Amino acid sequence: MRASLLTQATSPLVATLKNLLSTSFSPEHDVAGITDPFLQVKILRFLRVLGRDSIEVSEAINDILAQVATNTDASKNVGNSILYECVLTILEIQADAGLRVMAINILGKFLGNRDNNIRYVALNTLNKVVSIDTNAVQRHRATILECLRDADISIRRRALELTYTLINESNVQALMAELLQFLEVADVEFRLGLTTQICIAAERLSLIHISEP
């Protein structure tokens, strides 16, 4: 589809989403104080498809995505559903760097949610995007490490995978200490892989010291 046609298809979707975000919009399909969250989710998914391979569409929807990210109530489950779709859209299109950081920060906030499913999908998504913007994910390292102590084994597993990915020359010593603490209480199924990763981290740390003058 030509860029001009994609942009034309985008405009009415953006306008509708703006209306849904407006407090003056008719609340006929209100759910927990949020206007028609199901339609908002569908529009975000459609925008994701349109903007995935189009710089023009991505530029056209950056502003509305920022509005959704900042104005949606995260204290409600329906709000979190909208925010998650917004995050996925931001991360899949050619979004501004600042908008990507905003999306990753939303995922970081999800890690503190009491809902296991929300924490899990946040970790899963962070694992997928850490290679895109490692620095933005690193800012949430403390919260990610807290997830190593989560009661849910699937959350601990995802947090551990993400922790491995975050290890670099500047934090290898601190993260190795965290992994050693986790090893003491880790489930049996984690120990072999965890020990291997600790050995790799230790080797990296020794190489850093060897290279130092």
Segment roles from a protein language model:
Residues 1, 17, 47-51, 86-94, ...:
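Hydrophobic residues within the alpha-helices of tandem HEAT/HEAT-like
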Residues 208-213:
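Residue-level detector of conserved catalytic or cofactor/ligand-binding positions
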Residues 6, 10, 40, 58, ...:
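Residue-level detector of extended alpha-helical repeat arrays and alpha-solenoid scaffolds
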Residues 33-47, 82-86:
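Extended HEAT/HEAT-like alpha-solenoid repeat tracts in very large eukaryotic scaffold/adaptor proteins
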Residues 49, 53-64, 75-99, 114, ...:
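Alpha-solenoid helical repeat scaffolds
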Residues 11-29, 33, 66-74, 105-112, ...:
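HEAT/HEAT-like alpha-solenoid repeats
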Residues 5, 9, 57-61, 95, ...:
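Structural marker for long, regular alpha helices in very large eukaryotic proteins
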